[in-house]
């Protein structure tokens, strides 16, 4: 799990395409959420499941905001390549 997280973190740092960055951030949040659920099951903690649900909700909101900004940028400029 740690190897997957660090690999995705390096992918996030090395990308210059905005869509790839959004996907990498979403997968990073999903990795953290899976780890929290796993540890909550190991220690029989219900609050970790609620926290994971909160993280998934925030990830969905972040994804919606990012994609709406991307669509707005595309409508304004006509292209999306190399925004960063």
From Swiss-Prot:
GO cellular component, one term: NADH dehydrogenase complex
TM segment ranges: 18-38, 51-71
A GO molecular function held by the record: NADH dehydrogenase (ubiquinone) activity
Family: Belongs to the complex I subunit 4L family.
Topology versus the membrane: Multi-pass membrane protein
EC number: 7.1.1.2
Protein name in the entry: NADH-ubiquinone oxidoreductase chain 4L
One Gene Ontology term from the biological process aspect of the record: ATP synthesis coupled electron transport
Compartment(s): Mitochondrion membrane
Gene3D superfamilies: 1.10.287.3510
